């Protein structure tokens, strides 16, 4: 019995030392440039501006972020030119937009018909030169949902990129 225990202990030590062996360093493919700067680029990505969430009940959603999570939450702001009412949720390093449809023609109404509980609608990323970004992305065969840049909910130029060209995510680019 002692011999069996000794052998088991030796095997365990051997297994443990194999588990402790240094893991080989794997270097991810990268360039020496930061992700937001590409050599020769005439535009650069900035920070994540916001994540927009379509909600079936704007008051309930706003109360959750304010009363349960303790976030700073704005009053509801109707934006008829965009077909939504929006509540802005300040998260410190970024924002969330809670979107609720204004009328049946709202793009958010269609989203909520397909997603009854609501959900993430889009992300917004700032760019330093939206016109250059649009021209460059067109050359790269990335489609947008409109032909031209429009003024967004924050009063800045924006354009939405087609989700089929962006890994299934609706991406809004906003002039920083």
Swiss-Prot record:
Compartments it resides in: Mitochondrion
Annotated residues for binding of Co(2+): 50, 122, 172
UniProt GO cellular component terms: mitochondrial matrix; mitochondrion
Recorded GO MF terms: metal ion binding; methylmalonyl-CoA epimerase activity
Pfam families, alphabetized: Glyoxalase_4
SUPFAM superfamilies found in the cross-reference section: Glyoxalase/Bleomycin resistance protein/Dihydroxybiphenyl dioxygenase
Protein name: Methylmalonyl-CoA epimerase, mitochondrial
Protein species of origin: Homo sapiens
Gene: MCEE
């Amino acid at each position: 019995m002692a011999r069996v225990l000794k052998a088991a202990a030796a095997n365990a030590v051997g297994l443990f030392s194999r588990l402790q062996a240094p893991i080989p360093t794997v270097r991810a493919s990268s360039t020496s440039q930061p992700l937001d700067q590409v050599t020769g680029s005439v535009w650069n990505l900035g920070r994540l501006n916001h994540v927009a969430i379509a909600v079936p009940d704007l008051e309930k959603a706003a109360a959750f972020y304010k009363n349960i999570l303790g976030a700073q939450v704005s009053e509801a702001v109707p934006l008829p030119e965009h077909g939504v009412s929006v509540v802005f949720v300040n998260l410190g390093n970024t924002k969330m937009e809670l979107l609720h449809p204004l009328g049946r023609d709202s793009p958010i109404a269609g989203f909520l018909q397909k997603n009854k509980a609501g959900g993430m609608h889009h992300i917004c990323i700032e760019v330093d030169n939206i016109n250059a970004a649009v021209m460059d992305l067109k050359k790269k065969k990335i489609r947008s949902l409109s032909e031209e840049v429009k003024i967004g909910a924050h009063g800045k130029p924006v354009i939405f990129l087609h989700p089929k060209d962006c890994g299934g995510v609706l991406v809004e680019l906003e002039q920083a």
